[in-house]
């Protein structure tokens, strides 16, 4: 059965609006999918606090993306150094003691809880899940990650009903090969740490074959880490356009914006495709909880089996067609 985003928010009752906050530090380390799911929250925070100085604390892979976001005034780097790196810990202490009215923790990790315990002044409001936070989040069980972040910024005075504009993301960038208008884009990669999230390459090849038989172009995207999966698909269906390693984030957004459909694993580019509004199907295994991690988009859906290899290519094709026709 094809599933879409339910939109149901649990535990979001009783949140309190923030006072007039002037200096706000937002924490979001990544990964790419989480950053994409946070776009609406970032935009909503800016809408609710138009005159505030908003800073985003993120990790090195996302500094460039963060610096291009139109909603933040300052981007700060968290290298997530080990605790034995005293110089880096001292630098982080300085960041948290830079006169913030509030810290909005959208990462909610053990590391950020330690930042609250070690570095945050008592006078700084802390929105998050850390023990002792002045503004604790409600129970987020079963709540989509995008909705969690919207609720978090609403508690600090943001507007969680804002939908972020994304024209800045590609900013007129041309996707590779003329954007491949109407193409079906395959996203066969995933985190190297979780190879079990990969749908088998032969299933992607079956999708490619079926799509090309209808006259559609098919492209494959990913990074160098996805080369093996991409090569397996290319060997089976050499008519695909191989864009692995050829797309930055802007080019990827442009490609997706002009594509006919996208099908991929639980990985950042699939979230991006869903968010720009392209018909997007995410394939999930036991490692993905769709109540938390389903892609957000007007024409996004997902299929899930405990063993991702049990998702049949025919079922995926049928689901993709329903998203296209919807």
Regions found by a protein language model. Name each.
Residues 1-326:
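Catalytic machinery of carbohydrate-active enzymes
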